[in-house]
């Protein structure tokens, strides 16, 4: 893994005004050759919003609830991450070559950077949105452990960057709103992390209906159990512990940290919360989306 030595903490690179992890920005060129298929299914989220959770659910659905098949490889090999590229590890595009149809794909890209082929092919999308406060806290911890990001700095300075859209993948506010708008004209199932926490079974039924598949209720119950945070946290095929420590240091903060709603309250000060709420109201004005930041 000597390739990884120089990967630590490069500055973000801007592409079409969107800040990205340096290596991911470099992957966007090769990604132009990607061709979507009508039977592809895209999992789209802003980072730290339940991507791996919904990926595991969808892989289980595609494998007919067979747990053994879901253990065949780590989640990032089972669900290729389109823009993923880090020295020493197969890129998303490389993983894609070995992925049989029907394919599950993952992205965090905002619409400005999304390969047009996905929209042209009317590929179905499962989008998961999570409340901004929990995303910001989770992202801060993720920046610490995933060394492809720049240094996060203090929590206060990171929160300011998050609010300004100066973190990897840019503005949360724009991301959740533009994919919401797309859901009115494109086959997008728009889910909320908080709804999944509250009643995972109900949300899994929604996903099944959306992808046009049916499974017996006992299989769905098994899926609820197997894709619970507790189970996924200890599952090496889901928890990213198979990634080299030089890239993701779980001793700093585990990839699967708390998986709860409302954890932001342990991190935000009263002043930060008030400041955030004022800014949030401005940025989300006129948007019909409403989020729950506690359950």
From Swiss-Prot:
The keyword DNA-binding does not apply. Its EC number is 2.8.2.1. The active site is at 108 (proton acceptor). Keywords: Catecholamine metabolism, Cytoplasm, Lipid metabolism, Phosphoprotein, Steroid metabolism, Transferase. One of its GO terms (molecular function) is aryl sulfotransferase activity. It comes from the Eukaryota. One of its GO terms (cellular component) is cytosol. GO terms for biological process: dopamine catabolic process; estrogen metabolic process; thyroid hormone metabolic process; xenobiotic metabolic process. It catalyses: a phenol + 3'-phosphoadenylyl sulfate = an aryl sulfate + adenosine 3',5'-bisphosphate + H(+); 17beta-estradiol + 3'-phosphoadenylyl sulfate = 17beta-estradiol 3-sulfate + adenosine 3',5'-bisphosphate + H(+); 4-ethylphenol + 3'-phosphoadenylyl sulfate = 4-ethylphenyl sulfate + adenosine 3',5'-bisphosphate + H(+); 4-nitrophenol + 3'-phosphoadenylyl sulfate = 4-nitrophenyl sulfate + adenosine 3',5'-bisphosphate. It holds the Pfam family Sulfotransfer_1. The modification Phosphoserine is found at residue 138. Substrate binds at residues 106-108. Sulfotransferase that utilizes 3'-phospho-5'-adenylyl sulfate (PAPS) as sulfonate donor to catalyze the sulfate conjugation of a wide variety of acceptor molecules bearing a hydroxyl or an amine group. Sulfonation increases the water solubility of most compounds, and therefore their renal excretion, but it can also result in bioactivation to form active metabolites. Displays broad substrate specificity for small phenolic compounds. Plays an important role in the sulfonation of endogenous molecules such as steroid hormones. Belongs to the sulfotransferase 1 family. Homodimer. This is Sulfotransferase 1A1. The lineage of its organism: Eukaryota, Metazoa, Chordata, Craniata, Vertebrata.
